[in-house]
Amino acid sequence: MRIILIGSPGSGKGTQAKIMSKKYNLPHISCGDILRKQNKCCDINKLIKKGELINDKLVTNIVLEKLKNINLFKGFILDGFPRTLYQANSIKENKIKIDYVLELFLQEKYIYERVLGRIIDKVSGEIYHLKFNPPKFITEKSNKNKILVRRLDDKKSALQKRINDFFKNSCLISEFYKKESLEKKLKYKIINADFDINTISNKIFNIINV
């Protein structure tokens, strides 16, 4: 089972991808995590801080290289890729079969609240939200050691740029996968992400388990 999760910043892609990864025993490939790990090797860090999209060809090559190192027949969950039409076409041109494309749709007015309240455990990679999904405990020690941190691109100054880029590209990607779905090449579904984590998970499971 090969699944793509796309959606705006704060729509819950990473959270849902991790839940699905555990449930279906599939590797979770996060485009964002891959790029953040690359920033020591190249100049990606500066672009991430500004909320700017990385060069299409560079991102595509990095993600495709990652996909080469896993069992494509067993499947995977690809989170946050493709973000542009070029990237979507690259998956198709490289003959990587996709079974499901799930788009988590979140209205722009909710994106700010979701993203600006997001914190991440630097050690485990677990994603929390100060309002909607707070960690069970936050000690002075954990704050001092900066175990709970904000992502570089979650700063308000970078967020608007990310939102603009997303909506500029999302229509093209949606149309691309609608066409693929009509041609029975995959299943493309839009899921309202303005719900709690468990409700969204159940919506996803209902689609996949049909």
Swiss-Prot record:
<feature type="binding site">
    <location>
        <begin position="80"/>
        <end position="83"/>
    </location>
    <ligand>
        <name>AMP</name>
    </ligand>
</feature>
<protein>
    <recommendedName>
        <fullName>Adenylate kinase</fullName>
        <ecNumber>2.7.4.3</ecNumber>
    </recommendedName>
</protein>
<dbReference type="GO" id="GO:0044209">
    <property type="term" value="P:AMP salvage"/>
</dbReference>
<comment type="function">
    <text>Catalyzes the reversible transfer of the terminal phosphate group between ATP and AMP. Plays an important role in cellular energy homeostasis and in adenine nucleotide metabolism.</text>
</comment>
<keyword id="KW-0067">ATP-binding</keyword>
<feature type="binding site">
    <location>
        <position position="36"/>
    </location>
    <ligand>
        <name>AMP</name>
    </ligand>
</feature>
<keyword id="KW-0547">Nucleotide-binding</keyword>
<dbReference type="InterPro" id="IPR006259">
    <property type="entry name" value="Adenyl_kin_sub"/>
</dbReference>
<feature type="region of interest" description="NMP">
    <location>
        <begin position="30"/>
        <end position="54"/>
    </location>
</feature>
<dbReference type="Pfam" id="PF00406">
    <property type="entry name" value="ADK"/>
</dbReference>
<feature type="binding site">
    <location>
        <begin position="127"/>
        <end position="128"/>
    </location>
    <ligand>
        <name>ATP</name>
    </ligand>
</feature>
<comment type="pathway">
    <text>Purine metabolism; AMP biosynthesis via salvage pathway; AMP from ADP: step 1/1.</text>
</comment>
<feature type="binding site">
    <location>
        <begin position="10"/>
        <end position="15"/>
    </location>
    <ligand>
        <name>ATP</name>
    </ligand>
</feature>
<keyword id="KW-0963">Cytoplasm</keyword>
<feature type="binding site">
    <location>
        <begin position="52"/>
        <end position="54"/>
    </location>
    <ligand>
        <name>AMP</name>
    </ligand>
</feature>
<dbReference type="GO" id="GO:0005524">
    <property type="term" value="F:ATP binding"/>
</dbReference>
<feature type="region of interest" description="LID">
    <location>
        <begin position="117"/>
        <end position="154"/>
    </location>
</feature>
<keyword id="KW-0545">Nucleotide biosynthesis</keyword>
<keyword id="KW-0808">Transferase</keyword>
<keyword id="KW-0418">Kinase</keyword>
<dbReference type="GO" id="GO:0004017">
    <property type="term" value="F:adenylate kinase activity"/>
</dbReference>
<dbReference type="InterPro" id="IPR000850">
    <property type="entry name" value="Adenylat/UMP-CMP_kin"/>
</dbReference>
<comment type="similarity">
    <text>Belongs to the adenylate kinase family.</text>
</comment>
<feature type="binding site">
    <location>
        <position position="151"/>
    </location>
    <ligand>
        <name>AMP</name>
    </ligand>
</feature>
<dbReference type="GO" id="GO:0005737">
    <property type="term" value="C:cytoplasm"/>
</dbReference>
<feature type="binding site">
    <location>
        <position position="87"/>
    </location>
    <ligand>
        <name>AMP</name>
    </ligand>
</feature>
<comment type="subunit">
    <text>Monomer.</text>
</comment>
<feature type="binding site">
    <location>
        <position position="118"/>
    </location>
    <ligand>
        <name>ATP</name>
    </ligand>
</feature>
<feature type="binding site">
    <location>
        <position position="195"/>
    </location>
    <ligand>
        <name>ATP</name>
    </ligand>
</feature>
<dbReference type="InterPro" id="IPR027417">
    <property type="entry name" value="P-loop_NTPase"/>
</dbReference>
<dbReference type="InterPro" id="IPR033690">
    <property type="entry name" value="Adenylat_kinase_CS"/>
</dbReference>
<feature type="binding site">
    <location>
        <position position="162"/>
    </location>
    <ligand>
        <name>AMP</name>
    </ligand>
</feature>
